[in-house]
Structures are given as structure tokens and as C-alpha cells.
Curated annotation (Swiss-Prot):
The gene is TEF1. PANTHER family: TRANSLATION FACTOR. Residues 192-194 are annotated as: G5. The modification N6,N6-dimethyllysine is found at K3, K316. Gene3D superfamilies: P-loop containing nucleotide triphosphate hydrolases, Translation factors. GO terms for cellular component: cytoplasm. Residues 14-21 are annotated as: G1. Residues 153-156 are annotated as: G4. This is Elongation factor 1-alpha. It comes from Meyerozyma guilliermondii (strain ATCC 6260 / CBS 566 / DSM 6381 / JCM 1539 / NBRC 10279 / NRRL Y-324) (Yeast). SUPFAM superfamilies: EF-Tu/eEF-1alpha/eIF2-gamma C-terminal domain, P-loop containing nucleoside triphosphate hydrolases, Translation proteins.
């Protein structure tokens, strides 16, 4: 066994009919985690329903349907491998909760793959003014997804026309530039997801195509296929060197062991012997042990779902939504208020100061008041349009001062991304999403346990 490949997360974006499912399905199918039996079963069903030609998309539709019915399908199905990476497709948009998932993102994407339909008229529809594509690309960029690959799909429908491809590259370069990406760092790859052309092996249909190239930190990388472009993603920097932030998902009381908080390490590391602080509870104590899947861990790192045992803390003192951090290294604190950039997605009316919906930020679920609408901004450029607007409505972006109804721990997105983005829920749907720009932290002295005092003396 060589060293385990690095894991990367990709998100696939693009217009409804750009062929995202077929393309993603094809990658998973050819390089992926779907076992032969499942594939044969799907193929048989697809053939019976006369959808044989659709088999790659069909694979994905099956997975999606099962996912939406709440059947947790083996997430391995959404994985595939390149020579360098284990790739996980963390979401395929078109999925109705795509925007919410991107925001509360169970995981941060390292790279976005934008699929553009090359067909006549299709391309134009896909990136028109109100296009979804723009929205998804903008969202990816706003949420810190800094790497992008553009796949120009359905090249078979325009007979692999070189001029068409170049025209699309020119237009798309302008488009991604407006969103914030530097086109020189973006590989543009012509493909046919339907035929699987130029996805994994270089196509023989476009002798004119010399391959893609992109600028990287180290210089330049080149290749021909989509798989090579994914393999050329810059290795992600995992936030192990940041101070610890671990939002609690649950707190258990386990006989003979005591209090065991459980959650995912978002940044930093957690290990036995550390003195940690829970915010906004304001409790400081020592970590006795850390485990994952019932095995002791030397340390938990970002991405690990861990349980850890703490001394002298009762289950009543800490709860889901609290954040655990290192008491000696930028410990987490509660906040009195925070300022965020909020984009209203679908609200039937107008939102004005005083509006108090529920915010989902990391694992916290707390009502927050829109205290002051500070400015309205153009969501395409980020430029200010007016100061202190009276209200905002669907489609608007604004800077808002928010006040939580009870103690809450959040962070600026630039410091700790997973704790700096949120979804606004009201009327059983996501009405807005936001990114936190700054936080007014509250300083309250909390409880320091005997275990923590003892550990501090060591």
C-alpha cells in the first residue's frame, strides 16, 4: 500500500440542460466507486424503460432519487479517482437544495467544474443575464471556491467545430472573469459527456485541439482530457494550522465515561490533554480522550467526525450549536451582533429591519434579527447601490447588521469559512443566504473546571 491519495471535493455547476448528470455519471461510471453489480442493475432498468442511451445520466438520476428520498446511498457512489486524487462530487446542482447545501456546505469544494452546453442556442441560454449558471458560479466564488474547470459539453452536436469552441471560450472567459476568476488559471476542455469523448481518453474527433493549459503557482500545467484537468487541481491546503473550531452536533452522557461531545473538526486539531473552551456556553475544561468510529485517536484533524470525553462538565452545560476551541489559541466566544452580506433568494415579500427568521450556521439553529440594513449592493459586481435601504426583496444583496436572539458563536468567513456562512430559513424554505464579514464578540467570564485548572499548571 502506497501513501493514500489526497482527497479533493468538487462541485459540478451549470445550466439545467448542460449535461451535468451525464458528464458526472460518466466519470463516476468509468473511474468510480459504483460496483459492477449496481451498474448492471441500472443498465437493465434503463434498457427496459427504453432509456439505454441515457445510461450515464440514469445512473446519476437513480442516485439522486435515492438521495432525495432520504435513503442515504453509499456516498462511495459519488466518488471517482484520478491518478493523483480521490475525488468526491459533493453536490450536483439542479438538486433543489443546492444553494443551501453550498452555504451550510457539509464540506467546502476545492474546485468547481462548470459545464457549458456547446450546442447552438444552448450556450447562449445558459449564460444569459438571469442564468442559473451565473448564480452558481458567483456563489462558488463568494464561498471561496477558487479553482475552476470549464468543460464545453455536447461538442458532438456542433460536429467538434473549432470556431464554435473558440467562440465559447472567449465568451466564457469574460463570464468567469466577471464572476471573479482569472481565466488564465482555468482549463477549458471540449467534451461530449454523452459519448464519453475527451473525458478520460483524448478525443480523436478534434485534430485541431492541442489541449488545455492553465497557470499554476508552480508555473504552468497542460493536458487534454477532463480527467487530466481534474488531476491538475492544485492540492488543497487543509486548515490544520488554524486554531481549533469544532461545532458540536450532539452531546452524549455515557455511563462510566461521562460527558462526550460529538462534532466535526472544521479547523485546527483536537487531542487529549488540550484545554478547550466551549462558546457561547463559556465553559473551559480538559479533553481526556478523542475517538472516531470507536477507536482512540492521537488527534482529530479537519474533516474528522470525533467524539471526545471532557471532565467536570455536565450534559446540561453544553449543547448542539456550541463551538469548541483551544483555550490558549484564539478561543471561540459568543457574539452580541455580526455584520453579513446577505443575498435574498426567494422571499414572497419585502424584508426590512426587525425581520427575525431562523439562521442555520454550522450546527447552530437560532433566530436572529435583521437589526439594520446598512447598504444594498449590486450582487453582480459587489458595488454599493444605496445606503440604509428601507427594505430588500428577492434577488437583492445587502449588508446587514444581525443580532442573535440568544447567545451564538459565529466567525468572519475570511477567518473560519465553515463558521462564517449561513442560510436564512423561514416558511419552511431557505429565503436567503449570507456570508459573515465581521463579528462583535462578547467577553463574558465563564466556568473554568478543576480539570482545566490542573491541566494549566502542568
Amino acid at each position: 500500500m502506497g501513501k493514500e491519495k489526497t482527497h479533493v471535493n468538487v462541485v459540478v455547476i451549470g445550466h439545467v440542460d448542460s449535461g451535468k448528470s451525464t458528464t458526472t455519471g460518466h466519470l463516476i461510471y468509468k473511474c468510480g466507486g459504483i460496483d459492477k453489480r449496481t451498474i448492471e442493475k441500472f443498465e437493465k432498468e434503463a434498457a427496459e424503460l427504453g432509456k439505454g442511451s441515457f445510461k450515464y445520466a440514469w445512473v446519476l438520476d437513480k442516485l439522486k432519487a435515492e438521495r432525495e428520498r432520504g435513503i442515504t446511498i453509499d456516498i462511495a457512489l459519488w466518488k471517482f479517482e484520478t491518478p493523483k486524487y480521490h475525488v468526491t462530487v459533493i453536490d450536483a446542482p439542479g438538486h433543489r437544495d443546492f444553494i443551501k447545501n453550498m452555504i451550510t456546505g457539509t464540506s467546502q469544494a476545492d474546485c468547481a467544474i462548470l459545464i457549458i452546453a456547446g450546442g447552438t442556442g444552448e450556450f447562449e441560454a445558459g449564460i444569459s443575464k438571469d442564468g442559473q449558471t451565473r448564480e452558481h458560479a458567483l456563489l462558488a466564488y463568494t464561498l471561496g471556491v477558487r479553482q475552476l474547470i470549464v468543460a464545453v459539453n455536447k461538442m458532438d452536436s456542433v460536429k467538434w467545430d473549432k470556431n464554435r469552441f473558440e467562440e465559447i471560450i472567449k465568451e466564457t472567459s469574460n463570464f468567469v472573469k466577471k464572476v471573479g476568476y482569472n481565466p488564465k488559471t482555468v482549463p477549458f476542455v471540449p467534451i461530449s459527456g454523452w459519448n464519453g469523448d475527451n473525458m478520460i481518453e483524448a478525443s480523436t474527433n478534434c485534430p485541431w485541439y492541442k489541449g488545455w493549459e492553465k497557470e499554476t503557482k508552480a508555473g504552468k500545467s497542460t493536458g487534454k482530457t477532463l480527467l487530466e484537468a481534474i488531476d491538475a487541481i492544485e492540492p488543497p491546503q487543509r486548515p490544520t494550522d488554524k486554531p481549533l473550531r469544532l461545532p458540536l452536533q450532539d452531546v452524549y452522557k455515557i455511563g462510566g465515561i461521562g460527558t462526550v461531545p460529538v462534532g466535526r473538526v472544521e479547523t485546527g486539531i483536537i487531542k487529549a490533554g488540550m484545554v478547550v473552551t466551549f462558546a457561547p456556553a463559556g465553559v473551559t475544561t480538559e479533553v481526556k480522550s478523542v475517538e472516531m468510529h470507536h477507536e482512540q485517536l492521537v488527534e482529530g484533524v479537519p474533516g474528522d467526525n470525533v467524539g471526545f470525553n471532557v471532565k467536570n462538565v455536565s450534559v446540561k452545560e453544553i449543547r448542539r450549536g456550541n463551538v469548541c476551541g483551544d483555550s490558549k489559541n484564539d478561543p471561540p466566544k459568543g457574539c452580541d451582533s455580526f455584520t453579513a452580506q446577505v443575498i435574498v433568494l426567494n422571499h414572497p415579500g419585502q424584508i426590512s429591519a426587525g425581520y427575525s427568521p431562523v439562521l442555520d450556521c454550522h450546527t447552530a439553529h437560532i433566530a436572529c434579527k435583521f437589526d439594520t440594513l446598512l447598504e444594498k449592493i449590486d450582487r453582480r459586481t459587489g458595488k454599493k447601490m444605496e445606503d440604509n435601504p428601507k427594505f430588500v426583496k428577492s434577488g437583492d444583496a445587502s449588508i446587514v447588521k444581525m443580532v442573535p436572539s440568544k447567545p451564538m458563536c459565529v466567525e468572519a468567513f475570511t477567518d473560519y469559512p465553515p463558521l462564517g456562512r449561513f442560510a436564512v430559513r423561514d416558511m419552511r424554505q431557505t429565503v436567503a443566504v449570507g456570508v459573515i464579514k465581521s463579528v462583535e464578540k462578547s467577553d463574558k467570564a465563564g466556568k473554568v473546571t478543576k480539570a482545566a485548572q490542573k491541566a494549566a499548571k502542568k
